[in-house]
């Protein structure tokens, strides 16, 4: 009788252990790594509280050239899914992402995915070859919707039990971005034609320019090149002296000294800081993808209408 009772107790204990283990497995959240704060924010809007999310490049830092920390390698090696921009961002310059996923023993299209998949690529000036793509596709809100859709698709594949949750969030989020896209087109269209030009430090507004029908100019073309050389500044100053542009802009993640020199030499004021490669710090204006795009649209429209 004692043996029978002991056996029953062991069986019940094992059953309880199995039930707890099964519950932990069922409750286990996906671990997701995003290469920068913009992709992380879009992911958060789709994934909600269903994932554990880590963003590699800190807010305010340049994602073109970054040196991953040991913690980044650890998080990446443990991740169920990794989202990166692609099109010459993390794999351009010092190719930091290529090295990271190699060290983390991750495989493309199995562990890590480009959220820019199916975006119509724009190239750097006078270039059409691989490695010369302009990576700033997210500055067109329509491309932001493509990013969100790709993230939703991959999360649904990795975590099918929450597929309907991800789809529902995508529908709401994409509608929000679509509405802002229409607002952008309307606001930018009201800028006087002779003043219609976005002038920034890096030439990162090609996608924005095409989407919202506004030309752009810059000091240097991409952050992996020389930045703010005397010849670059001289060329932009010469161009601006022939224009009626009323405002300059400087990105939040770059050194503002070259643009201050341009402003001094042309007499054109710097209207505002705008966001390109990173969202703002939490609690500040522009601390999400939606908020940074709204900020940019408002500052550009207001600055160039003066």
Swiss-Prot record:
It is a lipid-anchor. It is found in: Cell membrane. A lipid is attached at residue 20 (N-palmitoyl cysteine). The keyword Iron does not apply. InterPro entries: AdhesinB, Bact_metal-bind_prot9, Lipoprotein_PsaA-like, ZnuA-like. PROSITE patterns: PROKAR_LIPOPROTEIN. Belongs to the bacterial solute-binding protein 9 family. Lipoprotein receptor antigen (Lrai) subfamily. This is Metal ABC transporter substrate-binding lipoprotein SloC.
């Amino acid at each position: 009788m004692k043996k029978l009772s002991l056996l029953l107790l062991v069986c019940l204990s094992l059953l309880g252990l199995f039930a707890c283990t099964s519950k932990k497995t069922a409750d286990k959240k996906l671990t997701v790594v995003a290469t920068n704060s913009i992709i992380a924010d879009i992911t958060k809007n789709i994934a909600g509280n269903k994932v554990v999310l880590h963003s590699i490049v800190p807010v305010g830092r340049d994602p073109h050239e970054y040196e991953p920390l040991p913690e980044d390698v650890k998080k990446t090696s443990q991740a169920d899914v990794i989202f990166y921009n692609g099109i010459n961002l993390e794999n351009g310059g010092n190719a930091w992402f290529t090295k990271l996923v190699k060290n983390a023993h991750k495989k493309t299209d199995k562990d890590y995915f480009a959220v820019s998949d199916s975006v119509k690529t724009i190239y750097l000036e006078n270039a059409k070859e691989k490695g010369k793509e302009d990576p700033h596709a997210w500055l067109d809100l329509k491309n932001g919707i493509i990013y969100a859709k790709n993230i939703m698709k991959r999360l649904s594949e990795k975590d099918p039990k929450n597929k309907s949750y991800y789809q529902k969030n995508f529908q709401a989020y994409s509608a929000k971005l679509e509405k802002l896209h229409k607002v952008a087109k309307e606001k930018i269209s009201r800028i006087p034609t002779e003043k219609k030009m976005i002038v920034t430090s890096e030439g990162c507004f090609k996608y924005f320019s095409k989407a919202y029908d506004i030309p752009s100019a810059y000091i240097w073309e991409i952050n992996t090149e020389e930045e703010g050389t005397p010849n670059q500044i001289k060329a932009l100053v010469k161009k601006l002296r022939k224009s009626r542009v009323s405002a300059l802009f400087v990105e939040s993640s770059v050194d503002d000294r070259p643009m201050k020199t341009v402003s001094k030499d042309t007499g054109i004021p710097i209207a505002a800081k705008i966001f390109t490669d990173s969202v703002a710090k939490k609690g500040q204006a522009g601390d999400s993808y939606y908020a940074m795009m709204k900020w940019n649209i408002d500052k550009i429209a207001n600055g160039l209408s003066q």
